[in-house]
């Protein structure tokens, strides 16, 4: 990433909070101090650490990201982020671009088809080459020209997707929009779980909905999310509960929020909440 672009971002980004930019689907996070592990749901997106370093915990796996790799999240994934080293002089800057599946499909329709490879383990850590980084650099610089964003942003984003699809890992992105691929089916399953948080999961029914055997569904679900379907649902429930508690503040009714996200037992909810976030839900109100 061009240092001039980094300096420009440092002048406009707020610290220690997420900023949604004028480019649709493009977000930034700038941290000027270390932070404990923060749990959140990463929407389907491409993420790049433009400056500094951060650790991402996905299930039991920990990956360290700098500006040499991007993070590819094909589905909504519960993550924890840990920034060990950040300061006012050397902030950590993270870019996130939501995946535009319609745009990816359009590009695939216009480019020569390639022989598909086996689905394999998806993986979230991809090497980041100069051509992709240069395209992101131009997308960021476009923020200085707001009148050009409507026309040029989509062209640059198309180039980014084209280069990602042409890269060694391109088939992993392609699978996300190809009907019948394992990735596409698991993406449908995660969407269903997210939109039915307060309902119990029947794995057999969910596997059937995706046209997969139960064993195959379990295998591919865990390859992509690093969690079992039940673990995935629990993480989403707890993160949604945390969001609701923050929204309602002092007026939050913990037992009602627990029921809203699918917990029948408030005590079980409190135990699992504290296990994930390190504090009880009631202490969030203080």
Describe the residue ranges of each PLM region.
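A short, N-terminal "cap"/entry segment at the start of jelly-roll beta-barrel domains
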Residues: 1-22, 35-36, 118-120, 142
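Amphipathic alpha-helical segments enriched in hydrophobic/aromatic residues interleaved with Lys/Arg
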Residues: 104-159, 163, 189-191
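Basic/polar phosphate-binding segments, predominantly the helix-turn-helix DNA-binding elements
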Residues: 159, 163-170, 176-178, 194-196, ...
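Residue at a beta-strand N-cap/secondary-structure junction
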Residues: 55, 200, 251-252
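N-terminal regulatory/effector-sensing and dimerization cores
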Residues: 17-115
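Short helix-to-turn junction characteristic of helix-turn-helix DNA-binding domains
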Residues: 193-196, 245-248
